[in-house]
Amino acid sequence: MTDRVIIFDTTLRDGEQALKASLTVKEKLQIALALERLGVDVMEVGFPVSSQGDFESVQTIARHIKNARVAALSRAVDKDIDAAYQALKVAEAFRIHTFIASSALHVEAKLKRSFDDVVGMAVAAVKRARNYTDDVEFSCEDAGRTGIDNICRIVEAAINAGATTVNIPDTVGFCLPNEYGNIIAQVRNRVPNIDKAVISVHCHNDLGMATANSLTAVQNGARQIECTINGIGERAGNTSLEEVVMAMKVRQDFMGVDTRINTQEIHRVSQMVSQLCNMPIQPNKAIVGSNAFAHSSGIHQDGMLKNKNTYEIMSPETIGLKKEKLNLTARSGRAAVKGHMADMGYNEQDYDLDKLYDAFLKLADKKGQVFDYDLEALAFIDMQQGDEDRLVLDKLSAHSTKEYPATAFVQLKLDGEKLSTSSIGGNGPVDAVYNAILNLTGLEIKMSHYNLTAKGEGAEALGQVDIVVEHKGRKFHGVGLATDIVESSALALVHAINAIYRAHKVADIKSHKHH
């Protein structure tokens, strides 16, 4: 019988820490529900003690997830463990994940304790967590740089205290595959009570080894992999869920293990996370990159036409990537749009069909032909825009020449009332439009990030603008999508301002018209 590897997804905890701006609770829940459909065994969704916002998002997700175990992180500190329990207790099934650093560097420099003290703290933390649940995971942070004797000692103590999963993280992505596999093998062979717990691994990609290290660990006895969608995470990222899952599936002959992941959901979840997290996927990214199933070489194309197995070790359909259909136009009905979304694996509850169809018709009038990837972008950008936007972009025009400064005319609607202004100056039309919008709203905003990506191909491709702005010491994310770059830039700023209104309850900007 094939062994099963537990997939522990930490996109919403370790992955989210790497984002330029935090996700909203609604966006986190959307991702959590997608992860549930993907079939992850455990999803780690936050660090409840870190902020009230994190506590509430963990609690909201815990309330909604029925077919996966919901986990939350806590340091080996009573208040952390108590907060994790309070946030998780509404869940159908939950896990408390507690950790403490184990490497000499961390123990001496950060904790300023002896290793004996650290073992004692780990034991106390696991025991406290066991008061709340019989599913407790213990991690020795920076295990990759911890001596093997100390790893075995703290793992044995944690299991004796009641830990049911023991995680051996390569926190800084320091290990090479054989070295890391040897650590796991020694834990498996030297810890006398190891049969009472699952060995877990959590790898970072600083040297590009996260996937290789995780798979080598499985070959040496690990039965849980901690990973994120698209490999998002701090610094160079975490182990990529899609890479380890597909490696174990495609090379089951060699690995001899399986997961309960529904791989046909991979493409869909990957796209959702990329859009909502404002983290573009590199084109040559394994499994989910836009080039992953593209064959540009003439020899490859010839081979593919004769027999696709010549250069393709897995089919795009395995990850839920369907062949592109081209025939969506302004004459296409709602059923056609719904059908295309269904072909890509999206259920009706994933998006608002009315809003998507309205947005589709506007785009189809401009582009003529709309592709599946356009629909996908429209569905998820709309999801981010939210229902309670006070500020709406009504009209826009911008003009720029070499001889004269750029000019812009902008008309906004605030709570239904029209506001309009013109601006002259700025470094090009986008800058002029931004100056006009900021003049109208009277908000003090500093732009800290601006990114433009093409969604689709050709001159009529959609341009997606992602921005991060700073207002009163906080960062807000905005995203806009249009065939015109100036329009998508304006939509992104309006989106960010609506986020500011919701977060800070800024005074009605109509008062600024009189100043």
UniProtKB/Swiss-Prot annotation:
Key word Transmembrane helix present: no
Gene this chain is encoded by: leuA
GO biological process entries: L-leucine biosynthetic process
Organism: Haemophilus influenzae (strain 86-028NP)
Name this protein carries in UniProt: 2-isopropylmalate synthase
Keyword terms of this UniProt record: Amino-acid biosynthesis, Branched-chain amino acid biosynthesis, Cytoplasm, Leucine biosynthesis, Manganese, Metal-binding, Transferase
Substrates-to-products reaction catalysed: 3-methyl-2-oxobutanoate + acetyl-CoA + H2O = (2S)-2-isopropylmalate + CoA + H(+)
PROSITE patterns to which the protein is assigned, alphabetical: AIPM_HOMOCIT_SYNTH_1, AIPM_HOMOCIT_SYNTH_2, PYR_CT
Pathway, per record: Amino-acid biosynthesis; L-leucine biosynthesis; L-leucine from 3-methyl-2-oxobutanoate: step 1/4
